[in-house]
């Protein structure tokens, strides 16, 4: 599955809120009269849609998510929780959760265009796995700071997860610890995603 570049509203109508993809949300009952009454979803369809939520929210291709599932399966702890921790600790997601980018695609652009430093060094990989005590900040130039300032000014005020600290006037964020599962930024049943891939490998 390639990275999704199509209409975002269409996806959130089908899958629900995907804050990493877009900060818009469908109005309650929107387009209900236009949609035919759907049949009861199969278990496969339910698992597939949970997997798609992760891909669209975090901006992952199919093979990338599969790699994360494999890494999580080999780690200590419940596979689903470890999977979400791995995704939440990506640099592009950390920038998004800090409010330094309005969406994960916007955060990815900041990283790809070399506007972001981690511990004083430019990091241009959105998938960089952040660690406790990492310091994330913008380059010391007007263009980079303006991009972050615009995002901080336009992003809706949300409670910052407890594994992060933001210093907005310094254009800097700190990673305090590995994220706790209750602070994950997406409503998701991660066990269904793990089940989806385990059943795919057995098929």
Curated annotation (Swiss-Prot):
Annotated function: One of the primary rRNA binding proteins, it binds directly to 16S rRNA where it nucleates assembly of the body of the 30S subunit.
Annotated region (Disordered), positions in chain: 19-43
Domain S4 RNA-binding: 89-152
Subcellular location: Plastid, Chloroplast
An individual GO BP term: ribosomal small subunit biogenesis
Record-linked InterPro entries: Ribosomal_uS4, Ribosomal_uS4_bac-type, Ribosomal_uS4_CS, Ribosomal_uS4_N, S4_RNA-bd, S4_RNA-bd_sf
GO cellular component terms listed in the entry, alphabetical order: chloroplast; small ribosomal subunit
Organism of this sequence: Jasminum nudiflorum (Winter jasmine)
Taxonomy, superkingdom: Eukaryota
GO molecular function: rRNA binding; structural constituent of ribosome
Protein name, per record: Small ribosomal subunit protein uS4c
CDD domains (UniProt xref): S4 (cd00165)
Pfam families referenced in this protein's UniProt entry, alphabetically: Ribosomal_S4, S4
Protein family (similarity comment): Belongs to the universal ribosomal protein uS4 family.
Subunit note: Part of the 30S ribosomal subunit. Contacts protein S5. The interaction surface between S4 and S5 is involved in control of translational fidelity.
Keywords on record: Chloroplast, Plastid, Ribonucleoprotein, Ribosomal protein, RNA-binding, rRNA-binding
């Amino acid at each position: 599955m390639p990275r999704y570049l199509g209409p975002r509203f269409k996806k959130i109508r089908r899958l629900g809120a995907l804050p990493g993809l877009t900060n818009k949300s469908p109005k309650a009952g929107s387009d209900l009269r236009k949609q035919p009454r759907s049949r009861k979803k199969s278990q496969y369809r339910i698992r597939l849609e949970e997997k798609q939520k992760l891909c669209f929210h975090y901006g992952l291709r199919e093979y990338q998510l599969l790699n994360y599932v494999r890494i999580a399966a080999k780690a200590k702890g419940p596979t689903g929780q470890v999977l979400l921790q791995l995704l939440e600790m990506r640099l592009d997601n950390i920038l998004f959760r800090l409010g330094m980018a309005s969406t994960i695609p916007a955060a990815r652009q900041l990283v790809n265009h070399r506007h972001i430093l981690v511990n004083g060094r430019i990091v241009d990989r959105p998938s960089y796995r952040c660690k406790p005590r990492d310091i994330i900040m913008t380059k010391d130039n007007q263009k980079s700071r303006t991009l972050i300032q615009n995002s901080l000014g336009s992003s809706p005020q949300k409670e910052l997860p407890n594994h992060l600290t933001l210093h907005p006037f310094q254009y800097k964020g700190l990673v305090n610890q590995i994220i706790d599962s209750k602070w994950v930024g997406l409503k998701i049943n991660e066990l269904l995603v793990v089940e989806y891939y385990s059943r795919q490998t057995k098929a």
